[in-house]
């Protein structure tokens, strides 16, 4: 009887450990993303879900590494603070890898590299090719982006206004409150090409001077999560999965 009891107790302990392991394995990775960074991350009004390049990448990474993801939408400027406060485990957005950010965030291998785009009112027919063409003007940029400091440090502009979202900048360009706006080229190009802002145009001949690479961010020191993300990304780059996702969103 005693042996039978010990066998049952041992089996129960193993079952409990197995269930605990399953719970940990199935625990979702919380991903902070923005609802206004199309095509990288945006709110799909048809599904009421956050979609885009970074979401597709995180889903593929999770599938490869055996974890589910849970998207938490928030404004771009609050992403790092949310990560540091452990409100999210990962940042998946159009976030440049910069030395300043690397002081508080550990980034994955670079995913895509691009520069800033300039947009102005459609009725403004001037051929803008550089920042100097806007010398003495009021311009707009999204708060929290890597463009704020270099634009300020350039000393070219009368004033630099910061906004929560790119649509907010576009609105003020259309209203004549600012002369032009700077934003991630793929994001603003995608939004304008969708035809939702007929009063705004891209400065097609503008040459970007602030290139950067986008990566996935994790909390400083979270090597376990970072290693999983990088392992999956390297597989995906090797087998063409990353390029396929980028191509689906018009970036290849």
Descriptions of predicted regions:
Residues 55, 70-81, 126, 161-175, ...:
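Short helix-initiation/N-cap motifs at beta->coil->alpha
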Residues 66-68, 85-93, 137-138, 174-187, ...:
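Alpha-to-beta junction loops
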Residues 55-65, 137-138, 143-145, 213-252:
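Extended ligand-binding regions for polar small-molecule ligands
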Residues 94-103, 150-153, 179-210:
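A ligand-binding cleft/hinge motif common to bilobed small-molecule-binding domains
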Residues 121-138:
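Flexible hinge/capping segments at coil-to-helix
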Residues 35, 113-117, 193-234, 251-252:
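Periplasmic-binding protein-like
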Residues 26-95, 103:
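Extracytoplasmic small-molecule ligand-binding "clamshell" domains
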Residues 41-44, 58-67, 144-165, 192-197, ...:
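Ligand-binding cleft/hinge of the Venus flytrap
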């Amino acid at each position: 009887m005693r042996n039978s009891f010990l066998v049952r107790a041992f089996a129960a302990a193993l079952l409990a450990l197995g269930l605990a392991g399953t719970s940990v394995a199935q625990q979702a990775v919380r991903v902070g993303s923005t609802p206004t960074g199309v095509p990288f991350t945006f709110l799909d009004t048809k599904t009421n879900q956050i979609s885009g390049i970074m979401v597709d990448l995180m889903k593929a990474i999770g599938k490869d590494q055996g974890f589910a993801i849970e998207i938490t939408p928030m404004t771009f400027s609050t992403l790092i603070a949310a990560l540091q406060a452990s409100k999210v485990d990962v940042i998946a957005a159009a976030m440049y890898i910069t030395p300043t950010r690397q002081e508080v965030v550990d980034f994955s291998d670079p995913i895509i590299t691009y520069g800033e785009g300039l947009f102005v009112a459609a009725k403004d027919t001037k051929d803008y090719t550089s920042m100097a063409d806007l010398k003495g003007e009021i311009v707009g940029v999204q708060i929290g982006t890597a463009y704020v400091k270099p634009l300020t440090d350039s000393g070219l502009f009368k004033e630099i206004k910061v906004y929560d979202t790119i649509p907010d900048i576009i609105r003020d360009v259309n209203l004549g409150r600012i002369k032009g706006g700077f934003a991630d080229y793929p994001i603003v190009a995608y939004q304008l090409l969708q035809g939702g802002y007929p009063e705004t145009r891209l400065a097609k001949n503008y040459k970007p001077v602030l290139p950067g690479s986008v990566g996935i961010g994790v909390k400083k020191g979270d090597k376990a999560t970072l290693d999983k993300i990088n392992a999956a990304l390297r597989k995906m780059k090797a087998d063409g999965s990353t390029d396929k996702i980028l191509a689906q969103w018009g970036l290849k």
